Amino acid sequence: ELFFIQLNILRTSNLRKLKLRGIVFPSVGDYFNTFYKEYLPFELTNAQKRVVREIRADMGSGRQMNRLLQGDVGSGKTLVALLSMLLAVDNHCQACMMAPTEILATQHYATVMGFLKDMDIKVALLTGSTKKKERNKILPAIASGEIQLVIGTHALIEETVVFSSLGLAIIDEQHRFGVEQRSRLWTKNAVVPHVLVMTATPIP
């Protein structure tokens, strides 16, 4: 009986590994290297460097990354998230960042655009307030892969949003989204994308 219990545990473990198989990001390419060497406005802290190395290792392992990025407001989480997104683009995938409010999504978009202003990367902002005319331009560009990075709110999980190849999904303040909302983001790709969750350090 114990043998069969162990066999069942092993089977469950193997099934879980199969389900968690992720997209392999084997290379660090021009987008990441160019930004890091030429456009990074300041030196990363040792903690940021360590986290970026760990994220690179996770996304190159063949297993789906599911990582929590925790830090105070202003600690540089968005920059680490951006470097992760550039790794996705270097490996011919798209990346998205979902925030719980339009204000926060707009702030992230402005920050990312500020960092990438001198680079040839297509970034879009998609929220509930995005005008229909603009939305009609953005959605086909996401579906074709022309838009590489998408930042938005719950609007990202609407059925009309179809990605060409979503490799990385970043969620800011995950606790403000429901389980169903988060899971709908995972289904935006045939293979479950890598997941990076950003959250502020809890106050003791």
Language-model-derived ranges and their functions:
Residues 100, 107, 128, 154, ...:
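Conserved H-loop
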Residues 1-96:
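Pre-Walker A segment
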Residues 94-101, 126:
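Conserved RecA-like ASCE P-loop NTPase motor core of nucleic-acid helicases/translocases
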Residues 92-96, 122, 145-149, 165-168, ...:
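Loop/turn-to-beta-strand initiation segments
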